[in-house]
């Protein structure tokens, strides 16, 4: 249902025609900017409450004065409305909602769902079918867990492309960290049992798992299966050793602790996580607020949004009561398919965890405010130097990286007044240009980034930095002009004398040059953005170059065509396996004779190449 009045929006009339069903409502400004998303147990009553009487604070007054239209979505329950509200806030970023700003995806342990499951670190969208365990507050925790999984349960970690094409076990098998399912060195039922036990461990059931292994060990011993009993004994010993090292508190087996600190219209939510009694560390979040949101409102919004994307533990400790706690608890329990308890009045060890989280949240917020203050000062200095009337809300910077024209990559990094916005960084693999032509590379990258913005009505930067001189800047100008992009201030960042930091020249689109000097906060801001663009570009370039060089090693060998190349890679499970093989092993591949095997071996190891005379034509 949607109403767009010609003049002032009549909120009372709109609310009067709504049903009393639960649902989600959205408020829009006259230019269709989304102002606010909210949920309601009864739409008519909740929406009507905004327009009956005087708004209770300045934020509401400002928001309601801009409303030009509203629309609603009816849901089956208030819990369903809560979930939809969180999805819309995350995807649409309404101006007046508290929203979780999380530029990095959390790492998880992924256990795939296939005949021979693999276990691996995973970030990003859950495109792979399987169980996701986490989230972990850092990669270190995931790697420690994976190391334990390989040691205890010997599950494979290799990609499917390698797994399907191996003809002999890899190094992981040789050092006892994989059971070798790729070459049938473990029976399917035994591997499935290892997967089941690994799942129990990851679910926090290590005590139950230990009892089960002990029972199986006793059964094997009674059946005189001494080798199996010995393996189970070693597994149990490793499991107990791990538990003794890593348990912090047996009563904190599966627990998240959340504390919220507020100061100067800023907020910090600190998350302390325990899984299976292990302290996984802390992570800090700085939600976008409107300055008048209370700490309990901020924390409530965080709980709803964060656990809409991450699996909640069975117990979540909060440093304060949050609005609609029972509803949120019910929604989380439904989504997680297990009971989730929100608690704030706790004693003993749990009270200690809350105190620890609260102190850390306060300290982290003070540190962040100090850092933000300096960052905002540099951003304001940039505005003044460039003569802009409005604050600089978004800066983008492009850089090009290649090795003598090879594997050219362009980077685009994004900063706002608070610092880098890493979730919006982009890389562009450049193709179809003369190798080493930085001008063409820059133009292609600019065209690709801004064409998409034009087609999708995407956000544009206030300032666009180009790492380069007048030539690079001219290419960016031409690309933007072709696309009809206006109101973006272009600035070229040219190397200074002897390429020394602090001596950079800033080239404006009208040809002027600015040399603010090393002490300028504005130049320090530009240097920070430029250096980040350079880092991001060169990292992408090195990865692309390495991949290309690894692939091309076989292509450079006379006598190796597409068919033989595919046979070699399939037989050895990839270039790494082929490089580890000797000449005799290579010669056993169909279509490869001894002479060709010698040439392949020499090429891969940087040795003098034997004469290619007498070899068959490439296949």
From Swiss-Prot:
Q: Where is this chain's protein located in or outside the cell? A: Cytoplasm
Q: Which residues form the UVR domain?
A: 207-242
Gene3D superfamilies from the entry? 5' to 3' exonuclease, C-terminal subdomain, GIY-YIG endonuclease, UVR domain, UvrC, RNAse H endonuclease domain
UniProt cross-references to PANTHER family, sorted A to Z: UVRABC SYSTEM PROTEIN C, UVRC/OXIDOREDUCTASE
Protein name, entry field:
UvrABC system protein C
Name the PROSITE patterns on file: GIY_YIG, UVR, UVRC
Task: List, alphabetically, the GO terms of the cellular component aspect.
Answer: cytoplasm; excinuclease repair complex
Instruction: Provide the gene name from the record.
Output: uvrC
Question: In the record, what terms sit under GO molecular function?
Answer: DNA binding; excinuclease ABC activity
Q: What does this protein do?
A: The UvrABC repair system catalyzes the recognition and processing of DNA lesions. UvrC both incises the 5' and 3' sides of the lesion. The N-terminal half is responsible for the 3' incision and the C-terminal half is responsible for the 5' incision.
Q: Which UniProt keywords apply?
A: Cytoplasm, DNA damage, DNA excision, DNA repair, Excision nuclease, SOS response
Q: What is its main location?
A: cytoplasm
Q: Where is the GIY-YIG domain?
A: 20-98
Q: Can you state the subunit structure given in the record?
A: Interacts with UvrB in an incision complex.
Which NCBIfam families did the record assign? uvrC
* Residues of the signal peptide: none
Please give a single GO biological process term from the UniProt record. Answer: nucleotide-excision repair
Protein family according to the UniProt entry: Belongs to the UvrC family.
């Amino acid at each position: 249902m949607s109403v767009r009045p010609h003049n002032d929006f009549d909120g009372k009339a709109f609310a009067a025609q709504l049903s009393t069903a639960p649902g989600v409502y959205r408020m829009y400004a006259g230019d269709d900017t989304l102002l606010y998303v909210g949920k309601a147990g009864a739409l008519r009553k909740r929406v009507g409450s905004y327009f009956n009487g005087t708004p209770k604070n300045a934020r509401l007054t400002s928001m309601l004065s801009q409303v030009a239209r509203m629309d609603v979505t009816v849901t089956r329950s208030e819990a369903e409305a809560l979930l939809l509200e969180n999805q819309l806030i995350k995807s649409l970023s309404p101006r007046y909602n508290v929203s979780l700003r999380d530029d990095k995806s959390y790492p998880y342990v992924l256990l795939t769902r296939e005949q021979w499951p693999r276990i691996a670190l995973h970030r990003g969208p859950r495109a792979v079918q399987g169980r996701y365990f986490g989230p972990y507050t850092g990669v270190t925790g995931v790697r420690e867990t994976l190391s334990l999984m390989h040691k205890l349960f010997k599950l494979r970690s290799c990609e499917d492309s390698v797994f399907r094409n191996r003809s002999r076990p890899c190094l992981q098998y040789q050092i006892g960290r994989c059971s070798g399912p790729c070459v049938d060195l473990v029976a399917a039922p035994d591997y499935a049992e290892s997967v089941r036990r690994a799942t129990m461990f990851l679910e926090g059931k290590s005590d139950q798992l230990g009892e089960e292994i002990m029972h199986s060990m006793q059964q094997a011993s009674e059946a005189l299966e001494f080798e199996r009993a010995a393996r189970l004994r070693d597994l149990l010993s490793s499991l107990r050793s791990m538990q003794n090292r890593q348990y912090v508190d047996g009563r904190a087996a599966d627990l998240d602790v959340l504390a919220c600190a507020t100061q100067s219209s800023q907020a910090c939510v600190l998350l302390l996580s325990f899984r299976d009694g292990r302290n996984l560390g802390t992570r800090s979040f700085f939600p976008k607020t409107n300055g008048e949101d209370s700490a309990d409102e901020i924390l409530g919004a965080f709980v709803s949004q964060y656990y809409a994307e991450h699996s909640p533990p069975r117990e979540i400790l909060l440093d304060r009561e949050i609005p609609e706690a029972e509803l949120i608890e019910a929604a989380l329990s439904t989504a997680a398919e297990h009971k989730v308890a929100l608690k704030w009045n706790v004693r003993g060890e749990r009270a200690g965890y809350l105190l620890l989280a609260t102190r850390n949240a306060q300290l982290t917020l003070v540190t962040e405010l100090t850092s933000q203050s300096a960052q905002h000062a540099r951003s304001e200095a940039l505005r003044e130097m460039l003569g802009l009337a409005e604050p600089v809300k978004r800066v983008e910077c492009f850089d090009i990286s290649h090795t003598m024209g090879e594997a050219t990559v362009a980077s685009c990094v994004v900063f706002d007044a608070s610092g880098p916005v890493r979730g919006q960084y982009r890389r562009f693999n450049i193709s179809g240009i003369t190798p080493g032509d930085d001008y063409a590379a820059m133009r292609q990258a600019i065209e690709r980034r801004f064409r998409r913005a034009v087609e999708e009505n995407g956000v544009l930067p206030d300032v666009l930095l180009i790492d380069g001189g007048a030539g690079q800047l001219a290419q960016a100008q031409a690309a933007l002009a072709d696309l009809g992009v206006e109101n973006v201030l272009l600035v070229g960042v040219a190397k200074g004398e002897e390429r020394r930091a602090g001596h950079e020249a800033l080239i404006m689109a009208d040809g002027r040059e600015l040399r603010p000097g090393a002490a300028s906060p504005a130049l320090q801001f530009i240097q920070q953005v430029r250096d980040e663009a350079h880092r991001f570009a060169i990292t992408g370039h090195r990865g692309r170059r390495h991949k290309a060089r690894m692939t091309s090693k076989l292509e450079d060998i006379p006598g190796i065509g597409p068919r033989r190349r595919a046979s070699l890679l399939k037989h050895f499970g990839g270039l790494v396996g082929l490089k580890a093989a000797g000449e005799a092993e290579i010669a056993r591949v169909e279509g490869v004779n001894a002479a060709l095997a010698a040439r392949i071996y020499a090429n891969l190891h940087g040795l003098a190449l034997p004469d290619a005379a007498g070899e068959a034509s490439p296949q």
